[in-house]
Amino acid sequence: MCSIGEDDFGDEGATHAMLPGSSTVGTVITAGSCNKCGLNSLELYKLNFRAAECHQCFLSYARHKFRAALGAAKALPRNAEVLLLVDGSAESLVLLDMLHFAQTQNTFKRLHCSARVLHIDAQSSPSENDPLPMLNELRERYAPFEFYVIQLGAEVHSLKLLKDYSASRLDSTDNKLRSLTARQDYVRQQRKRLIGAVALQLQCTHVFEPSISSSLAAQLLTSVALGRGGSVALDVALLDDRLQGAVTLLRPLKDLNEQEVQFYIKAQQLKPFRSDESSLLSDASLQNLTSAFVANLQLNYASTVSTVFRTGDKIAAKRQPIEEGPSTCALCQSDLDSGLSDTLLAIEYSRAVSEMGVALQQQNNMEALEQRARERLNSMDNLCHACRNIHAELTHGSLI
């Protein structure tokens, strides 16, 4: 039993509470000797729990994590066609730089694959910063990669090369959803569907997603809270095979943390230009609050975030038995969880009570109430539980 009582929390605050550990900021030392190669350097990078390293030793360490993630699981076959997602975030630029470096090495060390770069334009208003100038700078720096752009919500045939792209106004379904939580979840699923369609269009067999440990920890908690527990393992795993057309999504930066990403940005003088989700953290949604919670943990208790993230590696993905045949959600492509279960029935029962209200008291018919709950559970049987929750927030129109 816990021996800490209320008296232990006096005017001095939580005396026995967990104390903040190492921050994620790290230290850049102006000059000194590298603890790994022994050479003098004008700038040393001091990561938490690692000795100070010179510019080249740090880059070798970070790039090894990228190569090790792909090599340990043998997830990327030789001469694979890869679609790399660049959204302007720091981690996406790090992944782009690492992949370009791996492709420009000698034959022995070269990563043997062909890469194309995709940017999904999700600007909701013309007043937002135009990403095209920054993308053109990246195209020149990382030649000969081909850069493609497509608008979120557009048809796949509207995919354009960066040099030929011009934005147009589209009618967005997410504006028809009542809550910000539902809108953000829908945009995430819509984005995944579009990525899979573009990969098929460009004949790419693999997609590189720039997710790091802290973002995957936030995604794990968010998926559980949204009712996606059956597919949470694939949401944070190195390999996700739910995209259409047997396209495989890979997360080769999953072992990098925020501190390593920021040091890499500084070392390579990269310029992130994304300001979308991170700027919305003041708006209340389940995703934003979870991200803020994990960011605070990462700042004060970095090892706790690692524990949350590593939990995802121990969760097995829920799969349909082979004899039952494939049965996936029409929106998120996860295995359907809409079978009759006590938990889902209880949720729909509660909703039915709220809907019937006074009529329930007048009729006093519990059988009708349970029948109503079963009908709700069996309706939209092509959607999983979480995607049905999105549909419930839809004011008009259709999700798909």
From Swiss-Prot:
Transmembrane parts of this sequence: none
Keywords: Cytoplasm, tRNA processing
One cellular component term from this protein's GO annotations in UniProt: cytosol
Entry-linked Pfam families: CTU2
Major site of localization recorded for this protein: cytoplasm
Molecular function in Gene Ontology: nucleotidyltransferase activity; sulfurtransferase activity; tRNA binding
The UniProt record lists the keyword Membrane: no
Keyword Cytoplasm: yes
One GO BP annotation of this record: tRNA wobble uridine modification
Similarity field: Belongs to the CTU2/NCS2 family.
HAMAP family in alphabetical order: CTU2
Function comment: Plays a central role in 2-thiolation of mcm(5)S(2)U at tRNA wobble positions of tRNA(Lys), tRNA(Glu) and tRNA(Gln). May act by forming a heterodimer with NCS6/CTU1 that ligates sulfur from thiocarboxylated URM1 onto the uridine of tRNAs at wobble position.
Protein name per the record: Cytoplasmic tRNA 2-thiolation protein 2
Upper lineage: Eukaryota, Metazoa, Ecdysozoa, Arthropoda, Hexapoda
